[in-house]
């Protein structure tokens, strides 16, 4: 179920302050965050966020297409190694 329109998008307060500070100072340093649950707002376009995926920080550059999504959607937490195949398939026989 989607979030109610009357509530508005969720963004952590500290993250909004960091975005405003970065926009005011024209700073190109990435903003480090653990807040994967925050929604990407139009104010964030052009900024780079380092989003934590549980192990490392993944750089995410925000464009217009990202608006409305969550930060965590662009920092995958699981690595897919592929399905196990037989040895003959790998050799090519």
From Swiss-Prot:
GO cellular component, alphabetical, reads: cytoplasm; small ribosomal subunit
Keywords (A to Z) from UniProt: Ribonucleoprotein, Ribosomal protein, RNA-binding, rRNA-binding
Which residues constitute the signal peptide according to the record? none
GO biological process terms, semicolon-separated? ribosomal small subunit assembly; translation
Q: What does this protein do?
A: Protein S19 forms a complex with S13 that binds strongly to the 16S ribosomal RNA.
Say which family it is in: Belongs to the universal ribosomal protein uS19 family.
What is the protein's given name?
Small ribosomal subunit protein uS19
Instruction: Identify the species of origin.
Output: Helicobacter hepaticus (strain ATCC 51449 / 3B1)
């Amino acid at each position: 179920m989607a979030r109610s329109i009357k509530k508005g998008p969720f963004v952590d307060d500290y993250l909004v302050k960091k975005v405003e500070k970065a926009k005011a100072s024209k700073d190109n340093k990435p903003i480090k965050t653990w807040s994967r649950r925050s929604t990407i707002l139009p104010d964030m376009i052009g900024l780079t966020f380092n989003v934590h995926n549980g192990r490392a920080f993944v750089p995410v550059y925000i464009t217009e297409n990202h608006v409305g999504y969550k930060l965590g959607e662009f920092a995958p937490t699981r690595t897919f190694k592929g399905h196990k195949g037989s040895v003959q398939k790998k050799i090519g026989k």
